Amino acid sequence: MKYKVIVYYDSMEDSERVFSNENDAINELHRLRLKYRNARKYKVEMVEVDD
């Protein structure tokens, strides 16, 4: 199982990072949410993908 952390800007995909470790993906998700917490047009989410 792999995990993608996706950053959306104005409802369009801006960047994407793929992790094989769920903990690393969660850490990156929290880091990016802190970075973009005051930017209304940015949204960060994590999704699971099959290999």
Range-by-range predicted roles:
Residues M1-S15, K41-V44:
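Short aromatic-glycine-(Arg/Gly/Cys) micro-motifs in beta-strand/loop hairpins
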Residues I6-V7, L29-R31:
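Short, well-ordered helical secondary-structure segments
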Residues D14, H30-D51:
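Short, mixed-charge low-complexity intrinsically disordered segments
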Residues N23-L29:
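Short amphipathic alpha-helices within nucleic acid-binding modules
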